[in-house]
Regions:
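Divalent metal-dependent hydrolysis catalytic cores, especially in the metallo-beta-lactamase
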Residues: 12-33, 134-136
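Short secondary-structure capping/turn segments at boundaries of alpha-helices and beta-strands
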Residues: 10-12, 23, 66-72
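Short amphipathic alpha-helical segments and helix-helix/interface helices
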Residues: 12, 34, 38, 123-127, ...
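Functional cores that coordinate and move charged inorganic groups
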Residues: 155-162, 171-192
Length: 192
């Protein structure tokens, strides 16, 4: 559910107005949007992981990212966890898309696809695509769709990601998150 004006050109326009230099390309898992990204973005500078709109001389750069929704059962509980995925380039994003599709993901269904896979399985798929990728648990405190969510989450990152926890280098706390509350959870001390 996005605005009909959510196009790369508009994203660049409003980023310039707001003074934002680096933004997410968003939703690289959606096949039509991914095709659009491949046609209209070019890595600049080459090897940086930052992309510019081919048709623009703007300084605004895109990072290659998406968000997915994992809904699955683990330890006799239904889990609902949203994850942000950052890829170092479009080639890695294509490998992630293939890995998800090969495991039955219906990527064309939504910009943020609902996957019947565990958060841990997503980390595996992403790291198989490229070791430089990052998986970041999204809005970690929201009740229904977060790793620490009271209605469907876990009590720790370790409980969710098990032996792959060391690959979780950051969490997205969300705009409504209370920083002083975050600081109380020592598990987050070494995580961005």
């Amino acid at each position: 559910a996005t605005s009909k004006f959510f196009e790369l050109e508009e994203m660049v326009k409003w980023s310039k107005i707001k003074g934002v230099d680096i933004i997410s390309c968003a939703d690289f898992t959606h096949p039509r949007w991914f095709s659009n990204l491949k046609q209209n973005l070019v890595e600049n500078p080459v090897g940086s992981g930052l992309y510019k709109l081919k048709s623009s001389d703007s300084h605004v750069r895109f990072i290659i990212s998406t968000e997915v929704s994992c809904i699955y059962r683990q330890n006799d509980k239904t889990r609902r966890v949203h994850l942000c995925i950052l890829a170092p380039n479009l080639e890695a994003a294509a490998k992630i898309n293939k890995g998800l599709a090969d495991r039955g993901a219906k990527l064309a269904s939504d910009g943020r696809p609902i996957l019947g896979m565990s958060a841990k399985d997503i980390v595996k798929i992403v790291l198989e695509a490229d070791k430089k990728c990052m998986v970041i648990p999204a809005h970690v405190w929201t009740p229904w769709f977060a790793v620490f969510g009271s209605k469907s989450g876990f009590n720790s990152l370790q409980e969710c990601f098990e032996e792959l926890t060391p690959h979780i280098k950051a969490v997205e706390t969300g705009l409504s998150s209370d920083p002083s509350m975050n600081w109380r959870l020592s598990e987050l001390d070494n995580i961005t």
